[in-house]
Regions:
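Right-hand nucleic-acid polymerase module
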Residues: 86, 95, 190-194, 247-248, ...
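A common structural junction motif
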Residues: 254-262
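Beta-rich nucleic-acid/ligand-interaction surfaces
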Residues: 116-125, 237-240, 271-276
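Conserved two-metal-ion catalytic palm core of "right-hand" nucleic acid polymerases
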Residues: 1-166, 409
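Short, conserved aromatic-histidine micro-motifs
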Residues: 50-56, 226-233, 303-316
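Conserved polymerase palm-domain catalytic core
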Residues: 59, 133-233, 238-252, 271, ...
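Short Gly/Ser/Thr- and Asp/Glu-enriched loop/turn motifs at secondary-structure junctions
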Residues: 68-70, 230-234, 266-267, 400
Length: 409
């Protein structure tokens, strides 16, 4: 897609429809929506390239678009962070960039186990892959539950990303994909909205952060031949049977992070696999029988307990609605359903049933082995259909087992 096509009314209007999802009750969204056609047309003109006279007298085509001021606020779960939320008009531009150009250009080189901000590769997929790695290590490596884990975390990841290094990596990727150079200029405008680091809250920041450590992912997988590795933004793990190898890798990782202008925090350590891996809100243990037990972190349970305590006083006072409580609890319940948490979730649901005077069902425990099996069958279906030169279906039924696949596969 060229820059002119990106700035066209049709593309920006589709981006506006995406940007307003889940935000139509907010004041800025309502203001834009009241005059959506006029605002989108005005935005299209602002993004257009203009002829600008340079100090030497030469005339150069330049993007003169200036992003609006962002809103800064703090979030306190799971820990205190400062979020820089862009204005709604900039959300439209960011959606146009990400949905039409940036996502495909950047994610093509990402490894399978680089999670976050990608379709089908969120926290649920990260937990499933960790469980798959632990089970596979137990069954195929022949080491049982004996082994070592390198668990790493980057200190102040988003705030520490150097703009010059990020732009250099970004330009190399976009040039390789044949992206219009003016798209890179527009992205640089959004990178420079802050003097240092990347703003939490911008849609592009998530992809930029993943791309910034994409080279690191490939080094771990290709240079060190590590099979059991996963990363979610700044949080990563490596499972290996050789402690000395992990010590060498850790030394090299520190040097590599230093070259990126980053630093591993104090939580980075090498420890026995039997201790379990703290990843994506769960503590995952590998037992002597090869089973993986995933327990919800204590702070997540405590936060929900405190929320319920607040709701028990705020709901009768009219400070929070029934719908808001149900949506918040349902989201937490869906996440907690990955672990051994049935009794805990049922206990919290019972308290809310007394408060709201309604029946609250809880999610069934999510079986990550079944999810992995269904995905494997879907891949097998696609391979068979390709060989038979048949049209691919966008969705594959979970119960469909094509001819040629053994019953126990």
């Amino acid at each position: 897609m060229t820059y002119e096509e990106l700035c066209s009314f049709e593309v920006l209007y589709k981006a506006y429809l995406e940007a307003r999802k889940g935000k139509r009750s907010k004041s800025k969204t309502i203001e834009y929506e009241a005059q959506a056609l006029a605002c989108t047309e005005k935005l299209s003109r602002k993004l257009a390239v203009r002829n600008v006279r340079q100090p030497g007298g030469d005339i150069r085509q330049q993007i003169c678009y200036v992003p609006s001021k962002f809103e800064v606020f703090a979030v306190y779960e799971p820990k205190r962070r400062m979020v820089h939320a862009p204005a709604f008009v900039d959300k439209v531009v960011l959606h146009a960039l990400v949905d039409n150009i940036l996502y495909d250009a950047l994610t093509k080189s990402f490894i399978r186990d680089s999670h976050a901000s990608q379709t089908g590769k969120g926290t649920d997929d990260g937990l499933m892959r960790l469980k798959t790695h632990m089970v596979d290590y137990y069954r195929r490596e022949g080491h049982g539950a004996d082994g070592w884990v390198l668990k790493g975390d980057v200190r102040h990841f988003f705030a520490s990303i150097d703009h010059w290094k990020l732009k250099r990596k970004l330009k190399a990727v976009l040039d390789k994909r044949g992206v219009d150079p003016r798209v890179y200029e527009l992205l640089c405008i959004y990178i420079d909205v802050m003097e240092d680091g990347l703003p939490l809250g911008y849609q592009t920041s998530q992809l930029f952060a993943l791309m910034f450590l994409d080279e690191f992912d490939h080094i771990i997988k290709e240079k060190y031949r590590i099979k059991y590795y996963g990363r979610y933004m700044d949080d990563f793990y490596i499972i290996c049977s050789d402690k000395r190898k992990l010590q060498c890798i850790l030394r090299d990782v520190r040097a590599l992070m230093d070259s990126y202008g980053l630093e591993l925090n104090q939580k980075t350590a090498i420890f026995p696999l039997r201790n379990g891996i703290d990843f994506l809100g769960f503590h995952s243990y590998l037992t002597d029988t090869g089973a993986v037990i995933q327990k919800l972190r204590r702070d997540s349970s405590k936060r929900m307990k405190n929320k319920i305590k607040y709701w028990e006083t705020a709901y009768p006072a009219g400070e929070v609605t029934k719908g808001e409580i149900l949506r918040s609890f349902d989201a937490w319940d869906a996440h907690a359903a990955h672990g051994e948490t049935y009794s805990l979730r049922r206990k919290y649901a019972d308290r809310l049933e007394k408060l709201l005077d309604c029946k609250i069902p809880i999610h069934r425990k999510i079986n990550s082995n079944k999810l992995a099996r269904d995905r494997r069958r879907a891949r097998q279906c696609r391979c068979i259909y390709k060989k038979q030169h048949k049209a691919l279906s966008l969705s594959v039924s979970q119960n469909t087992r094509p001819a040629g696949i053994l019953p126990w596969a």
